[in-house]
Amino acid sequence: MSEKCRKYENRVTGMATVFPGEENADIILQEAFDSGLRGLKLHAHVQCFDMNSEHMNRLYECCRINKKPIVMHIGREPKSTAYGCDPYQLCSAEKLELVLKNFPDIKICVPHLGFDETSAYRKLIEKYDNLWLDTTMVITDYFPIEGKINLNDYRSDRIMYGSDFPNIPYAWDRELKELNAADISMDSLEKISYKNAADFFSIKLQPV
C-alpha cells in the first residue's frame, strides 16, 4: 500500500492495519506510518478486539504521537455468525466515549454512522470534536433502519461520505445518488462529499 501511495502521490491515501494484541503491534504500526501510510483502519467484528483494552491503548498512543487518525468499525451491526466474536459484547457508543475522553487528540471515524446505535453516535459527535462518522450503507435503504436518516440532524462538519466500494451489494453510485438527492445545503454537501475527509486525513486539497 505504501508503494501505491508513493506511485500515486496526492491521489491515494493509504491506511495501515494491525491485529490488536499481536506481538509488537505498536512497533509494526510505527513502521507503517514511517513508510508513508496515513492512518489506522480496524474492524472489531473481524479482528475481535476490545477498544478499551491495554493492547488498544498502545495503538492509540502510537496514533497520538504520530498525529494519525483511526477509522474503526465498532458499530454493533451487521452482526454475523461468521465472526469469531460477538460484536454486541465488544462494540458500543458508551465504550467509544471512554476512548474519546482518554485520547482527545486522536481523530476517530466510525463507519455506518455507528449503526445500529445511530442516535447515540449522533449525540457523541455533538459532544466530541475528535469524532467523525461516515455514511456507508446507512443513507441507502439497505440496512433495516426505522425511518430514513436525515443528514440535517447531524453535525455537518463531522460526517463523511463512505461507500465500502467495491464490497457492496448494490450499484456503486447508489449512495452518491442518495447523497445528491438529500435535502441538505450545498455547503453541507461539499463538506460531506470531500471537505470533511480532507480535514480528517489531513489532505491538502489541490486547486481544480
Language-model features: locations:
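Catalytic pocket-lining loop regions of alpha/beta-barrel enzymes
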Residues: 38-39, 52-160
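Flexible, active-site-proximal loop/turn residues at the rims of small-molecule/cofactor binding pockets
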Residues: 46, 137, 165
